[in-house]
């Protein structure tokens, strides 16, 4: 099961998750609109605790996924982060430099080098801190990654 966490301006039926669904991948995408980070993490933790999953998160949703993966690594089979907002010092991520990736499952990050919303340095710092086998794919696109749908689906 793929659990999709959309970003602040996204929705459970946004363009990226719709493209993934249309490719034939089964996706569960909760509605996180108007929710703080803690609320998103609570919902994801509950879903993840029920079965092994693959997590995918975009921007703010990527931050929530990274946090849940750190809390429940044994339940995660893989994770895809899209322009993740890993640098935001927001509760419970008051110290972003302490957020590290688990090393027991594959993780891919797709981030645009020209992202004007979340700097690519957020992803690069996460990769460097984590000291494990993360795959950072740098693309030329916007924060929304609208030109990278085929890459998102393949990852």
Model-based region annotation:
Residues 11, 87-88, 114-118, 143-144:
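Acidic catalytic loop of the alpha/beta-hydrolase fold
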Residues 102-103, 108-111, 115:
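Short beta-strand/loop motif that positions the catalytic acidic residue
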């Amino acid at each position: 099961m793929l659990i999709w966490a959309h970003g602040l301006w996204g929705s459970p039926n946004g363009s990226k998750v719709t493209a993934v669904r249309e490719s034939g991948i089964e996706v569960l995408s909760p509605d996180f609109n108007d929710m703080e980070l803690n609320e998103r993490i609570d919902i994801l933790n509950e879903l993840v605790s029920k079965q092994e999953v693959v997590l995918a998160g975009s921007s703010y949703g990527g931050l929530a996924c990274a946090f849940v993966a750190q809390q429940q690594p044994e339940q995660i089979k893989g994770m895809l982060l899209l322009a993740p907002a890993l640098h935001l010092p927001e509760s419970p991520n008051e110290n972003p430099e302490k957020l590290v990736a688990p090393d027991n499952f594959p993780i891919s990050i797709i981030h645009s080098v020209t992202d004007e919303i979340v700097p690519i340095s957020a992803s690069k710092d996460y990769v460097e801190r984590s000291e494990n086998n993360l795959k950072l794919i740098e693309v030329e696109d916007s924060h929304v990654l609208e030109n990278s749908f085929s890459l998102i689906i393949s990852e």
